[in-house]
Curated annotation (Swiss-Prot):
Protein name per Swiss-Prot or TrEMBL: DNA-directed RNA polymerase subunit beta'
Signal peptide feature range: none
EC number: 2.7.7.6
Classification of source organism: Bacteria, Pseudomonadati, Pseudomonadota, Gammaproteobacteria, Enterobacterales
Entries under Gene3D superfamilies matching the protein: 1.10.132.30, 1.10.150.390, 1.10.1790.20, 1.10.40.90, 2.40.40.20, 2.40.50.100, RNA polymerase II, clamp domain (4.10.860.120), RNA polymerase Rpb1, domain 3 (1.10.274.100)
Binding residues annotated for Mg(2+), in chain numbering: 460, 462, 464
Length: 1407
């Protein structure tokens, strides 16, 4: 008995490990795993179904087919455990060893492992420094390779064809050694001296200067070093022994009818064994070389197919013409081992059903059909039945449950009480897609869901299904209750706004109840309180909308958090007074004293949560829902065809538009406008007409005229049902009402261009056939887009999760002083996002001072909550430096202070929170709401793009930044700098508006001057770019020779002549080297210097420039010397929506990126080549100039002799994020990506907190390239993990040595995921083969730091509740203790014993 218990204990021991290492397997290692050699290709005997001896399923090698029973049946039962039968050679043990015992095949000739050969870059090729083509020719017996040159003129590794080999044999005899096949490659690999080769390459690296050569050398050095360090031997990449997978992992199952279903691997192994045996026989017979060679090649191909079918040549197909699934196919792809079984497992104790509404449920409840509950909670019911003594055995209990006896239902009630279940709706796009509820038993077969959680699940009741899961263990139940309960998930983790918000009916009900109406029944009464209001309403003495005075008692929290009552008489309506009864104490009456729309209700819940906390909010939310449903039913709001009131003006608006279109058509026919202009104008006319119709319609719907108490007419907001639905935010929008009662407007063709004949009808009037046909385009495109969108959005989320999965909060404070400056987002005249929204929930990086003083307003390291933000607003602070994850100094993970507030909970984030996954989900989840298309700008939009002035909206003072300007003759400022910004500051010092001012703009007001709202402050010519002089004097032409560098043109209409500079391509040979320029001289003819420098004022003119001055004219500063016509870029496509977000996160270079200045200095142009010009920037301090070739067609923003700063734009275009990082730093690139991504989401009205995007950016910046190795052991130009450089530098500096210098790299999310330190995580993401090959060669260790790796190896993840377990293990490891072993109690042991004995009895009781 005792040793049985010991045996059981050994069975339950869990493996504790800290890291997983992957390496090449040596032949001896493969043999040590093996339990015997597989010699025959046979599988099982088709008559007896017993495995053949020495075959692929041999019981002697792999273990018994039945538990504790040998093959011939001599030994049965547990007592013979461990005996090896002398007759059949099978060990008596459990069958499950057939899942773990491996075999092997001794190959008669070595074969190359295809992964190390063909997975690019080829490892064997890199190691031998031979091209892959040559190696393949040797391996597949087409050429010879020289292994030892001896005293001959043949080089080692030289490739010889058959003829060359024979010639060499004749010439040198056996002086040299050349072979073909894998033996040759193996010999080459064996004879390599890795250390010496490494030394040699390092020396070469120091001597060489060519960039490509350096890259190649570093690659080889890295590979060789990896081999040296990992202890892998190169010749192990050639297989001499092939391992055989355990048979139960490649099963063979008999189907009825004498056929077998088998895993493809068996076929592949059979081919290998057959060819191997044939090759052995041929070698024993000493067959002719050519036959042996052919057989060897076939063996090589068979092994290739087994390891990775289809990688080389055609894939081997089975009987049914489809390629066989090889070992590589087993692990890669969506159906492979990683994604199908390790990352996505199926679970027991779950059910699914359709969902319906449960309007009477509380927020933490869900309705569970009795049938489902009975099935899901079976084990608990069996247990209870036995415990009560109502059933003696499990079998009896089972029978009772099947009969559904009365007592079973009582027990079910008991079991279910306080036992939460998880509800999940696919697709689970964010963590709120799985929440816990307490089940309430219901009749029927549909799960009932609380209406308020629909928003989080994105569920509706048109046939959606949901899955139920039962948390079994106590810990699981505890987590479900404490963390996943729907009542604990009130706020969205993406933006910190409430996600439990009413929608549709509830909103309509509350809106209806809080509206007021002129002269309603009971207007003007004075009531004692909400109770009386309700009584009057119920008894029909007062209308719900009557304006009355009511005595209201409000409660307000004082400084100590006590509630203080305050009673006053309020002007309000009956409905609002009734609603006040459900509002929790502590909120002001003003929040219900308004017509409540969806936004107002959301704000009300948010306020409630911030002031009163979780519990009152949950109760309040439920009450809101019940009240809303009640009054929505009372309102009787419905949609009738007469609610869609068509405006009378519609006909005349349309006929006016038609007349204008006809007029333009005439102009087009008489040749006054071009076809494109006509099209754009027509579309503009119809768009304007549509707007007018919809405005007339909305004015019509919005108000109605009523008679008030005094008998006068008064306008009030309409009670039209459709209008109320749209106005409250319950359903529908102005655009949809426009289609119902206005006109449908312009439609797009399938290719996205707009059809110029609009649909003038609306749905109430009905469409004719043509109109209906046109409108089908749009509908069809919508459906197609949605399908594409879902797939793309899902893939984006997967990439985001993958790149961010290992980012966890690991410490409280990293102590950094770095951070990013937060300012409000202002585009033109509107504040898109106020500062408050951007800094709320962040931690300050430095003290915030009161503007204009040195007094500290907010100290450093303060978490900015609502009250702090109010303080910032009161003092009109305009910029705050906050901590950010991008600048966090924690090595693995981030610190809580750099992250700030946990948006879903409202306090600073806890340690162990998986912020990476939360960020990825928050960005990915709204992905399906983004559009898929690229926007074409045409018509009205493209004309608006060419702005030519700035008109301010508000009054205030002007502030210019980065400005250089000169005053012109009329006393106005002319801008001569490139990236000038004009800001409007209000009287409190806050920025209200911000505009970009181009070069050459004329300002009406100067810096610091006051302007009134609506005033124009700057204007410029959008079509030409001027050349402005900064000094006054006389113009002197240099190199301006008519016919060579310039030509004179006269305008027919005005008769004015102007000079046009010829492009270098148009010039004659003599004019090629001339540089046309305008020089400014004083009256004496001496050069005038540019103020502040010693350079003469000389303006070089580029080709196509137009000069309207004559030689020797007097000019004054600020005048235009020449104009350069700007080719307007035509209609540019703007990539929007999802593709744009993907481009940003993948850090793709745009097609024609902006050219930025690499260094600061003076611009000049060097010698031109055919299609390019040479830009030279000479630094002022006299160091080496920087040169760059720029295509001629790029329009440059700089003139010769101008001074630029590093990172300035030289030629416009979309900026490449890599350039921003290189030239302007980490913070600039963070700001760029965050702002660009936010622009896309903001357009769709989706709110995402900046810090989620910053988290992804931090992961994109994980790598750094070593610039100078210092005394570290990195290679120059090597790409390493940023944290590793930091740690290494810290150690070096502590020892007083020189650290490595590096430059940060920006990787796209796919690249970053594949470049992670963890090979398990990378392999499960994409390109499994390549990742595993690389890892094996380098002998990588996976420290299992991220979440994905731990899920794959089946451990608790180092986040959330698993964080403590991992911390504990790390502490133990540091202290060197053994991990706490799981204790086996006596009960456990006896239970396991019973199970084991049952197994030994051959399972007589197998129901």
């Amino acid at each position: 008995m005792k040793d049985l218990l010991k045996f059981l204990k050994a069975q339950t021991k869990t493996e504790e490990f800290d890291a997983i290492k992957i390496a090449l397997a040596s032949p001896d290692m493969i043999r040590s795993w093996s339990f015997g050699e597989v010699k025959k290709p046979e599988t099982i005997n088709y008559r007896t179904f017993k495995p053949e001896r020495d075959g692929l399923f041999c019981a002697r090698i792999f273990g018994p087919v039945k538990d504790y029973e040998c093959l011939c049946g001599k030994y049965k039962r547990l007592k013979h455990r461990g005996v090896i039968c002398e007759k059949c050679g099978v060990e008596v043990t459990q069958t499950k060893v057939r899942r773990e015992r491996m075999g092997h095949i001794e190959l008669a000739s070595p074969t190359a492992h295809i992964w190390f050969l063909k997975s690019l870059p080829s490892r064997i090729g890199l190691l031998l420094d031979m091209p892959l083509r040559d190696i393949e020719r040797v391996l597949y017996f087409e050429s010879y390779v020289v292994i030892e040159g001896g005293m001959t003129n043949l080089e080692r590794q030289q490739i010889l064809t058959e003829e060359q080999y024979l010639d060499a044999l004749e010439e040198f005899g056996d002086e040299f050694d050349a072979k073909m096949g894998a033996e040759a490659i193996q010999a080459l690999l064996k004879s390599m001296d890795l250390e010496q080769e490494c030394e040699q390459l390092r020396e070469e690296l120091n001597e060489t200067n060519s960039e490509t050569k350096r890259k190649k050398l570093t690659k080889r050095i890295k590979l060789l070093e990896a081999f040296v360090q990992s202890g892998n031997k190169p010749e192990w990449m050639i297989l001499t022994v092939l391992p055989v997978l355990p048979p139960d992992l490649r099963p063979l199952v008999p189907l009825d009818g004498g056929r077998f279903a088998t895993s493809d691997l068996n076929d592949l192994y059979r081919r290998v064994i057959n060819r191997n045996n044939r090759l052995k026989r041929l070698l024993d017979l000493a067959a002719p070389d050519i036959i042996v060679r052919n057989e060897k090649r076939m063996l090589q191909e068979a092994v290739d197919a087994l390891l990775d079918n289809g990688r080389r040549g055609r894939a081997i197909t089975g009987s049914n013409k489809r390629p066989l699934k090889s070992l590589a196919d087993m692990i890669k792809g969506k159906q492979g081992r990683f994604r199908q079984n390790l990352l996505g497992k199926r679970v027991d104790y779950s059910g699914r059903s359709v969902i319906t509404v449960g309007p009477y449920l509380r927020l933490h409840q869900c309705g569970l059909p009795k049938k489902m509950a009975l099935e899901l909670f079976k084990p608990f019911i069996y247990g209870k039945l036995e415990l009560r003594g109502l059933a003696t055995t499990i079998k009896a209990a089972k029978k009772m449950v099947e009969r559904e006896e009365a007592v079973v239902w009582d027990i079910l009630d008991e079991v279910i009480r306080e036992h939460p279940v998880l509800l999940n709706r696919a697709p689970t796009l964010h963590r709120l897609g799985i929440q816990a509820f307490e089940p309430v038993l219901i009749e029927g077969k549909a799960i009932q869901l609380h209406p308020l959680v629909c928003a989080a699940y994105n569920a509706d009741f048109d046939g959606d299904q949901m899955a139920v899961h039962v948390p079994l263990t106590l810990e699981a139940q505890l987590e479900a209750r404490a963390l996943m309960m729907s009542t604990n998930n009130i706020l969205s983790p993406a933006n910190g706004e409430p996600i439990i918000v009413p929608s549709q009916d509830v909103v309509l009900g509350l809106y209806y109840m809080t509206r007021d109406c002129v002269n309603a029944k009971g207007e003007g009464m004075v009531l004692t309180g909400p109770k009386e209001a309700e009584r009057l309403y119920r008894s029909g003495l007062a209308s719900l909308h009557a304006r009355v005075k009511v005595r209201i008692t409000e409660y307000k929290k004082d400084a100590n958090g006590e509630l203080v009552a305050k009673t006053s008489l309020k002007d309000t309506t009956v409905g609002r007074a009734i609603l006040w009864m459900i509002v929790p104490k502590g909120l002001p009456y003003s929040i219900v004293n308004q017509a409540l729309g969806k936004k107002a209700i959301s704000k009300m819940l948010n306020t409630c949560y911030r002031i009163l906390g979780l519990k009152p909010t949950v109760i309040f939310a439920d009450q809101i829902m019940y009240t809303g449903f009640t009054y929505a039913a009372r309102s009787g709001a419905s949609v009738g065809i007469d609610d869609m009131v068509i405006p009378e003006k519609k006909h005349e608006i349309i006929s006016e538009a038609e007349a204008e279109v006809a007029e333009i058509q005439e102009q087009f026919q008489s040749g006054l406008v071009t076809a494109g202009e006509r099209y754009n104008k027509v579309i503009d006319i119809w768009a304007a007409a549509n707007d007018r119709v919809s405005k007339a319609m909305m004015d019509n719907l919005q108000t109605e005229t009523v008679i008030n108490r005094d008998g006068q007419e008064e306008k009030q907001v309409s009670f039209n049902s459709i209008y109320m639905m749209a106005d409250s935010g319950a359903r529908g929008s102005a655009a949809q009402i426009r289609q119902l009662a206005g006109m449908r407007g312009l439609m797009a063709k399938p290719d996205g261009s707009i059809i110029e004949t609009p649909i003038t009808a609306n749905f109430r009037e009905g469409l004719n056939v043509l109109q209906y046909f046109i409108s089908t385009h749009g509908a069809r495109k919508g459906l197609a887009d949605t399908a594409l969108k879902t797939a793309n959005s899902g893939y984006l989320t997967r990439r985001l999760v993958d790149v961010a999965q290992d980012l966890v909060v690991t410490e409280d404070d990293c102590g950094t002083h770095e951070g990013i400056m937060m300012t409000p987002v202002i585009e033109g005249g509107d504040v898109k996002e106020p500062l408050r929204d951007r800094v709320l929930g962040r931690v300050t990086a430095e003290d915030v001072l009161k503007p204009g003083t040195a007094n500290i307003l907010v100290p450093r390291n303060t978490l900015l909550h609502e009250q702090w933000c109010d303080l910032l607003e009161e003092n009109s602070v305009d910029a705050v430096k906050v901590r950010s994850v991008v600048s966090c100094d924690t090595d693995f993970g981030v610190c809580a202070h750099c992250y700030g507030r946990d948006l879903a909970r409202g306090h600073i984030i806890n340690k162990g929170e998986a912020i990476g996954v939360i960020a990825a989900q928050s960005i990915g989840e709204p992905g399906t709401q983004l559009t898929m298309r690229t926007f074409h700008i045409g018509g009205a939009a493209s004309r608006a793009a060419a702005e030519s002035s700035i008109q301010v909206k508000n009054k205030g003072s002007i502030k210019l930044s980065n400005v250089k300007s000169v005053v012109n003759s009329s006393g106005k400022l002319v801008i001569t700098s490139r990236n000038t910004e004009l800001k409007l500051i209000d009287e409190f010092g806050r920025t209200k508006e911000s505009y970009k001012v181009p070069y050459g703009a004329v300002l009406a007001k100067g810096d610091g001057e006051q302007v009134a709202g609506g005033e124009t402050v700057a204007n410029w010519d959008p079509h030409t770019m001027p050349v402005i002089t900064e000094v006054s004097g006389f113009v002197r032409f240099t190199d301006m020779i008519d016919g060579q560098t310039i030509t004179r043109q006269t305008d027919e209409l005005t008769g004015l002549s102007s000079l046009v500079v010829l492009d270098s391509a148009e010039r004659t040979a003599g004019g090629k080297d001339l540089r046309p320029a305008l020089k400014i001289v004083d009256a004496q003819g001496n050069d005038v210097l540019i103020p502040g420098t010693d350079m003469p004022a000389q303006y070089f003119l580029p080709g196509k420039a137009i000069v309207q001055l004559e030689d020797g004219v007097q000019i004054s500063s600020g005048d235009t010397l020449a104009r350069i016509p700007q080719e307007s870029g035509g209609t540019k496509d703007i990539t929007g929506g999802l593709p744009r977000v993907a481009d940003l996160f993948e850090a793709r270079r745009p097609k024609e990126p902006a050219i930025l200045a690499e260094i600061s200095g003076i611009v000049s142009f060097g010698k031109e080549t055919k299609g390019k010009r040479r830009l030279v920037i000479t630094p002022v301090d006299g160091s080496d100039p920087y040169e760059e070739m720029i295509p001629k067609w790029r329009q440059l923003n700089v003139f010769e002799g101008e001074r630029v700063e590093r990172g300035d734009v030289i030629s416009d275009g979309p900026e490449a994020p890599h350039d921003i990082l290189r030239l302007r730093g980490v913070h600039a690139v963070t700001r760029y990506i965050v702002n660009e991504v936010q622009d896309v989401y903001r357009l769709q009205g989706v709110k995402i907190n900046d810090k989620h995007i910053e988290v992804i950016v931090r992961q994109m910046l994980r790598k750094a390239t070593i610039v100078n190795a210092g005394s570290s052991d990195f290679l120059e130009g090597e790409q390493v993990e940023y944290s590793r450089v930091k740690i290494a530098n810290r150690e070096l500096e502590a020892n007083g040595k020189v650290g490595a210098t590096y430059s940060r790299d920006l990787l796209g999310i796919t690249k970053a995921s594949l470049a992670t330190e963890s090979f398990i995580s990378a392999a499960s993401f994409q390109e499994t083969t390549r990742v595993l090959t690389e890892a094996a060669v380098a002998g990588k260790r996976d420290e299992l730091r991220g979440l994905k790796e731990n899920v794959i190896v089946g451990r608790l993840i180092p986040a959330g509740t698993g964080y403590a377990y991992h911390q504990d293990r790390m502490r133990r490891r540091a202290a060197g203790e053994a991990p706490a072993a799981p204790q086996v109690t006596a009960e456990d042991a006896s239970a396991s014993l019973a199970e084991l004995l049952n197994a030994g009895l051959g399972g007589s009781d197998n129901e």
